[in-house]
Amino acid sequence: MSNMLEITLIKSTIGATEKQCAVVRGLGLRRLHQTVTLQDSPETRGMISKINHMLKVK
């Protein structure tokens, strides 16, 4: 399971740009404090880096 990431949305998308909201939806996050488990890939890492101030990653 070392190649999996647990991503939690910790900041609301209210006030975020449209692109940031699209990245949140692209990661499969819909609600505040929702956690998803995704495979660790360059694509996922790139999306995380765009909105890292809104996420908690394990």
Swiss-Prot record:
Lineage: Bacteria, Pseudomonadati, Thermodesulfobacteriota, Desulfuromonadia, Geobacterales
Record-level GO BP terms: translation
Keyword Ribosomal protein carried by entry: yes
One family name in Pfam for this protein: Ribosomal_L30
Gene behind this protein: rpmD
Subunit structure, as described in the record: Part of the 50S ribosomal subunit.
SUPFAM superfamilies per UniProt: Ribosomal protein L30p/L7e (SSF55129)
The protein's name: Large ribosomal subunit protein uL30
PANTHER family noted in UniProt: LARGE RIBOSOMAL SUBUNIT PROTEIN UL30M, MITOCHONDRIAL RIBOSOMAL PROTEIN L30
Keywords: Ribonucleoprotein, Ribosomal protein
A GO term for molecular function: structural constituent of ribosome
Protein family according to the UniProt entry: Belongs to the universal ribosomal protein uL30 family.
Record GO cellular component, one term: cytosolic large ribosomal subunit
